[in-house]
């Protein structure tokens, strides 16, 4: 049973049924009563798509994230959905993984659902090759696209980002001023956020008169044990480091496990700084010093931006908020 059946049985157009569903006053009382009576007789329950046929809005926002098991992204999803509910909007969540074709598939799926906007949570949706972002740019001509801690230049695209460069720069500078000289950096990816963090690390070293040593920069899967084992291997190879800064708290937990395995005292002999200030940072002994990426604030800023973007029908520029 659908809106077309109601239209046929009531002898009115689909548009009229839609106007009745949405409480449009431009329907006579007689017609309204007839449509409602037919709906009752047929046992028809309107869904959000049917209601949206006569409106410019579905009251629904699409959310995409690469990995909902990631503590940062799990938090982002929670805050986004909470904020959307406060604006009386529903959400459709798609967890895409990291494959570009899968991202494109789910992006197009959300477009087919006629959502009012699409929110891309995290920086993994902005690809290094510009042509791989074309599907987002083309879609933004029709629907607002919001990025949480990702940046893409284009019309009708709105970015809210944490200043990852400044955050890591300040953290590394503080370590150096506290006496650390051989600061190892662990990172997970070359995403928009990851590149800014890397630049912050290198710039802090240069500003403080220390060399950028490639043997102290290592990529690592976002896994606690992998981070621990990598540091153990580096130590066995004779690479000396007195502090570790990581692009994610999971890697920082691995650094703490490394220190425990080597019987190195934290923070007396060894310093560890993580990123995102997630629950993981409070689950070690001692607790990890972690940079707060302010994910809640980013998300509670993104949703009002999304709301305004399709309420006011903006689209002539890229909005860019940095915190």
Predicted region positions:
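N-terminal helix-turn-helix DNA-binding module of bacterial transcription factors
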Residues: 1-57
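Periplasmic-binding protein-like
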Residues: 115-124, 184-186, 217, 238-248, ...
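Short, solvent-exposed amphipathic alpha-helices that sit
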Residues: 34, 72-86, 167-171, 193-211, ...
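Short beta-strand segments enriched in small/hydrophobic residues
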Residues: 16-19, 53-69, 182-188
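Flexible loop/turn connectors
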Residues: 232-323
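Hydrophobic alpha-helical segments within soluble ligand-binding/sensing domains
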Residues: 156-185, 195, 203, 223-233, ...
């Amino acid at each position: 049973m659908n809106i077309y059946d109601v239209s046929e049985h009531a002898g009115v157009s689909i548009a009229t049924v839609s106007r009745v569903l949405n409480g449009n006053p431009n329907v006579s009382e007689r017609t309204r009563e007839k449509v409602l009576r037919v709906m009752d007789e047929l046992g028809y329950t309107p869904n959000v798509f049917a209601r949206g046929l006569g409106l410019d809005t579905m009251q629904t926002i699409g959310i995409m994230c690469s990995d909902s098991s990631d503590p940062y992204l799990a938090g982002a999803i929670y805050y986004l959905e909470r904020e959307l509910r406060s604006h009386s909007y529903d959400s459709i969540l798609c967890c895409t993984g990291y494959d570009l074709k899968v991202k494109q598939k789910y992006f197009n799926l959300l477009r087919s659902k006629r959502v009012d906007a699409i929110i891309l949570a995290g920086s993994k949706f902005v690809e290094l090759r510009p042509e791989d972002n074309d599907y987002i740019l083309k879609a933004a001509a029709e629907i607002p696209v919001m990025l949480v801690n990702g940046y893409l230049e284009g019309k009708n695209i709105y970015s809210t980002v944490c200043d990852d460069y400044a955050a890591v720069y300040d953290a590394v500078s503080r370590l150096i001023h506290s006496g650390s000289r051989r600061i190892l950096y662990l990172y997970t990816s070359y995403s928009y956020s990851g590149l800014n963090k890397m630049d912050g690390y290198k710039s802090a070293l240069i500003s403080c008169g220390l060399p950028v040593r490639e043997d102290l920069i290592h990529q690592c899967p976002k896994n606690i044990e992998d981070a621990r084992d990598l540091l153990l291997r580096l130590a066995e190879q004779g690479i000396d480091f007195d502090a570790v800064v990581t692009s994610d708290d999971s890697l920082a937990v691995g650094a703490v496990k490394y220190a425990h395995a080597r019987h190195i005292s934290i923070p007396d002999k060894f310093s560890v700084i993580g990123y995102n200030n997630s629950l993981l940072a409070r689950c070690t002994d001692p607790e990890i010093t972690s940079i707060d990426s302010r994910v809640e604030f980013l998300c509670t800023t993104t949703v009002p931006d999304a709301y305004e973007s399709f309420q006011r029908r903006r689209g002539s520029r890229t909005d860019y908020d940095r915190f």
